[in-house]
């Protein structure tokens, strides 16, 4: 089930669960409210999204989009707007990211013009300019764990990617890559 892209040379950190089966997420020592500063401003994006998930598909859909991020809440949060066109219809997404100064963890929430709801957050932190953010979720009736990865090692061309696991993190299927280029 694991799909490795050429751009994906980073390992997903091993995940751990408590006695109730909940994810244990601990912030890195370097986690900071400034971790997303690289993303501030406008970007153009080349998206590569898996057409179907969990069917061993190798068929990808590619499309352009734009995104603009700005800080909120005196720097412990940020918001971005994601604009694209799917099937000749306008699509808008919005991300809210909040940094908890006590736990040093980021919570990332997503909403879009299709669902009109705020998704459960993915939670995590950055280490060495790479962030991993996890959550338990349900995808088409399956219990899954999802991970968002932010790779900011090249701050002018960051890469966001998403993977899901239906076997508690033993195997991951990458299903979306966003290759960004800063425009300001």
Regions found by a protein language model. Name each.
Residues 3-184:
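Hydrophobic small-molecule pocket/channel-lining residues, especially in calycin-type beta-barrels
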């Amino acid at each position: 089930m694991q799909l490795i892209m050429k751009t994906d040379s980073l390992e997903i950190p091993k995940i751990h669960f408590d006695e109730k089966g909940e994810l244990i997420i601990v912030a890195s020592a370097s986690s900071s409210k400034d971790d997303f500063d690289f993303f501030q401003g406008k970007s153009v994006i080349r998206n590569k999204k898996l057409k179907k998930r969990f069917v061993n598909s190798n068929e990808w859909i590619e499309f352009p989009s734009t995104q603009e991020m700005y800080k909120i809440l005196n720097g412990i949060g940020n918001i971005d707007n994601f604009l694209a066109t799917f099937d000749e219809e306008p699509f808008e997404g919005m991300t809210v990211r909040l940094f908890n100064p006590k736990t040093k963890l980021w919570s990332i929430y997503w909403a879009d013009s299709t669902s009109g709801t705020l998704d459960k957050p993915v939670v995590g932190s950055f280490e060495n300019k790479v962030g991993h953010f996890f959550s338990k979720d349900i995808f088409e009736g399956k219990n899954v764990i999802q991970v968002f990865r932010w790779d900011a090692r090249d701050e002018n061309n960051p890469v966001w990617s998403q993977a899901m696991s239906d076997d508690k993190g033993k195997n991951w299927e990458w299903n979306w890559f966003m290759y960004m280029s800063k425009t300001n």
